[in-house]
Amino acid sequence: MNTELITKLELSISNLKEKKSRIYFLVQDTKGNAKASIRVIYEMAYHLFENGYNAIIMHEQTDYKGVSSWLDEKYMSLPHKPIEGQNLEISPEDFMIIPELYGHVMEQVSKFPCGKIVLCQSYDYIMETLSPGTSWSQYGFLKCITTSEEQKKYLEKIMKNVSFDVITPTISNSFEKKPIPAKPIVSVHTRDQRDTMKLIKSFYLKYPQFRWITFRDMRGLSEWEFTSILKDSF
């Protein structure tokens, strides 16, 4: 092993020990709309940031909207870097954490000389952008963080040569019950808004005597609006 290589290796080890290595988290631009999966990523990044690690939010376009309209302003204090038009600084001691939806990005960064980790929150999206017959390990992603033991068991059956760890999403203290009785409101949150409307209309048709009950679609609300309405609901 030559002197130059030894020097680079020692520098990488030093950066890891001193928490100088970069930890990139790729996020989707929700254009100001609330999305639970993005909140989870920001929570992870901010926790590392608070503990002295060099956590960086990575997004695709330069006109990134951010999350301050629906999450706490503190999350925008994290360093943010766009992929578009910039050469990301990547070293062997760095880490890149990519959501399961971004199979095409995994392919693009497969040659990067850094640690690569998949963050899988929804198994529905695993095959969305992966080429047929391709697994994460073929792109150098040998580790995966997922959100439940059940999902871990499912992933282990289909993604070989990958190690899995479970980190359960946190729930903020704002999700607490009110001491006073709830109002006759039923809060509904579905992935597809059409499912919400089907549920509401079907309920009123089947139980016309309960038309005094109000339904509230919880999509697109900020965290504080969401928790406030949820506290008032059945």
Identify the role of each PLM range.
Residues S228-F234:
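Acidic donor-binding loop of glycosyltransferase active sites
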Residues S37-V40, M44, Q151-F226:
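Conserved catalytic-core segment of nucleotide-activated headgroup transferases in glycan assembly
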Residues L9-R22, P79-H80, S174-I185:
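Nucleotide-sugar donor-binding and catalytic loop/hinge architecture
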Residues Q28-V40:
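A short, glycine/small-residue-rich beta-strand->loop->alpha-helix junction that serves as a flexible
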Residues N54-Y64, R211-R219:
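A short beta-strand-loop structural module common to alpha/beta enzyme folds
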Residues V105-E107, E128-L130, F141-S163, K198:
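A short, active-site helix/loop in glycosyltransferases that binds the activated sugar's phosphate group
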Residues T3-I13, Y46, I56, Y64-F141:
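Extended catalytic core of nucleotide-activated donor transferases of GT-like folds
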